[in-house]
Amino acid sequence: HDRPKFCYLPADPGECLAHMRSF
């Protein structure tokens, strides 16, 4: 899954945070 650097979509907040932390 190629998620955007900034999670602004009402998708999974958990995955969003994980991606942000990974970045």
From Swiss-Prot:
Tissue expr: Expressed by the venom gland.
Cell compartments where the protein resides: Secreted
Superkingdom to which the source organism belongs: Eukaryota
Record keywords: Disulfide bond, Protease inhibitor, Secreted, Serine protease inhibitor
Domain BPTI/Kunitz inhibitor: 7-23
Primary site of residence: secreted
GO molecular function list: serine-type endopeptidase inhibitor activity
Residues marked Reactive bond for chymotrypsin (site): 17-18
GO cellular component: extracellular region
Protein family (similarity comment): Belongs to the venom Kunitz-type family.
Role, per record: Serine protease inhibitor that inhibits chymotrypsin.
Protein known as: Kunitz-type serine protease inhibitor C8
Native source species: Daboia siamensis
